[in-house]
Regions:
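Juxtamembrane interface at the cytosolic side of transmembrane helices
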Residues: 2-3, 9-26, 196-240, 247, ...
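Juxtamembrane amphipathic/hinge helix adjacent to a transmembrane helix
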Residues: 6-12, 169-187, 203-215, 372-394
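Polytopic transmembrane helical bundles with strong interfacial aromatic enrichment
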Residues: 34-35, 41-44, 341-344, 348, ...
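N-terminal membrane-insertion alpha helix
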Residues: 39-59, 241-261
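Membrane-proximal N-terminal soluble sensing/regulatory segments of transmembrane proteins
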Residues: 52-125, 256-328
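Polar/charged, Q/E/K-enriched amphipathic alpha-helical segments with strong coiled-coil propensity
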Residues: 120-191, 323-375, 393
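Membrane-interface helix-start motif
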Residues: 184-199, 389-404
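Mature extracytoplasmic or organellar-lumen-exposed domains after removal of signal/transit peptides
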Residues: 268-271, 277, 281, 312-317, ...
Length: 430
């Protein structure tokens, strides 16, 4: 009935939108919805940043480190096996022990990376490593056996083993390391990304401005200066925005430091260590072959150039705690390169006895001693940079502790404050 519908529209519980009570109801609904929507967006954004920070610190970085160490252990095992052969039928026990330790470490790191489930992207590389590592160790064992018996076939087995390492195992290990390092880079980039954070903070400011404008409008209509509910909502919003801004900016600064002065220089130094191992392997294989093979010498020069470039880059990237070790590594590398030139002259003169002593001897000026000190300096620098990453990443990840729940509770408090404050005004019209 028309009259009945008109009467219903005039009921106090259903004020028209053009009236003050009707506008208050619309404002209340809009503010509550805006607060809840912003709270959901803020909680989602913070959750993504916190999850990415945890991914970088607790998962990606350890796996990247394991893949890096696996590569280094494999390369060092090959160098150690080759160097031990040069000592004759009874190489020092320390070399045998170091070789076994490298193989055990590489196997353990391979298991750790495989257990993490790298997926199809590196599945083939992991399968190659698992299948071919026993093949490599078999060649080395055969070479060492023949060498201990005085048979010349030992060097052939070691050369085949080295080919297996450089053509199959190390490329597969490099693929695994590149994949895990890319995951670490992606997680760090997501944890330090700004676009969604800026949108969320801007949305919070917009909601806060809407609450402020509603307070002004209500004050003019009701001639009351303050609305307690809206005031509480404003306070909750301010706390949420300040907390988020401080956590995001502080956490981002820590995570950027973890990357810039931790994982990035550590990766550069790891690549330098790999180049050093490559050069040392070429140096010893040149002695084993005793053919004056220019390929080994050319490969040594290539690795030498890579090592020099990487050490120069690391010197500008590393944290202060690693600077001394990086400088020492550059000094040892330069001395090693100079000794290698002397060894090449002895090689050309066919003075293999003096060349062997210069390359594998442990006198203070020998290539062996310089390489050992270079490895120690690189290891110390890598550990120092990794410690910077661990400390800074932990601080960056910790900045998000409790923030997801805190933002959600504060957003609910904002919505409740708006609903309560405006409901009190509506009650005055009934």
């Amino acid at each position: 009935v028309p009259g009945h519908r008109a009467a219903r529209r005039r009921r106090p519980g259903f004020p028209r939108a053009s009236t003050t009570p009707g506008k208050v109801r619309l404002i209340r609904a809009g503010l509550v919805a805006a607060c809840l929507a912003w709270g959901a967006l803020a909680a989602l954004m913070v959750s993504q940043h916190a999850s990415a920070a945890r991914e970088a610190t607790a998962t990606s970085e350890p796996l990247s480190l394991a893949a890096q160490q696996m590569y280094q252990s494999l390369a060092d095992a090959d160098v150690t096996a080759s160097t031990g052969y040069l000592y004759g039928r009874t190489p020092p026990f320390a070399y045998r022990q170091r070789y076994q330790r490298d193989i055990a470490a590489a196997s353990a790191d391979l298991k750790a990376v495989t257990a993490a489930g790298g997926g199809p992207a590196i599945g083939a590389s992991l399968s190659t490593l698992a299948a071919d590592l026993p093949v490599y160790t078999g060649y080395v064992e055969d070479g060492q056996t023949y060498n201990s018996l005085g048979y010349p076939a030992g060097d052939s087995f070691l050369e085949v083993a080295s080919e297996e390492m450089h053509l199959t195992l190390l490329p597969a290990a490099r693929d695994v390391y590149a994949y895990e390092n890319a995951r670490l880079t992606a997680a760090s980039a997501q944890a330090t990304g700004l676009p969604l954070a800026v949108v969320t903070l801007a949305g919070g400011l917009a909601v806060g401005f809407a609450i402020y404008r509603s307070q002004r409008w209500l004050s003019r209509r009701t001639h009351r200066t303050l609305n307690v509910g809206l005031l509480l909502a404003s306070a909750a919003g301010a706390v949420a925005l300040i907390w988020m801004a401080v956590a995001l900016l502080g956490g981002r600064a820590d995570l950027l430091r973890a990357t810039g002065h931790g994982s990035t220089p550590a990766e550069t130094l790891a690549q330098a260590d790999i180049a050093a191992l490559q050069a040392r392997g070429d140096e010893t294989l040149n002695l084993i072959s005793r053919t004056g093979d220019t390929d080994f010498q050319a490969d040594f020069r290539t690795a030498q150039d890579q090592l020099s470039t990487l050490l120069s880059s690391a010197e500008g990237q590393s944290a202060a705690s690693a600077a001394g070790s990086v400088t020492a590594a550059r000094r040892e590398a330069s001395s090693w390169f100079a000794v290698n030139q002397q060894a090449q002259k002895l090689d050309q003169a066919h003075d293999y006895g003096a060349e062997t002593q210069l390359v594998i001897g442990q006198g203070s000026g020998s290539a062996g001693a310089l390489f050992t000190r270079l490895e120690a300096d690189l290891d110390a620098a890598i550990r120092a940079d990794q410690a910077v990453f661990a400390a800074s990443a932990a601080a960056g990840s910790g900045a998000f502790t409790g923030l997801v729940a805190g933002v959600a509770v504060l957003a609910l408090a904002m919505a409740a404050g708006c609903a309560w404050g405006l409901s009190r005004r509506l009650a005055e019209y009934r």
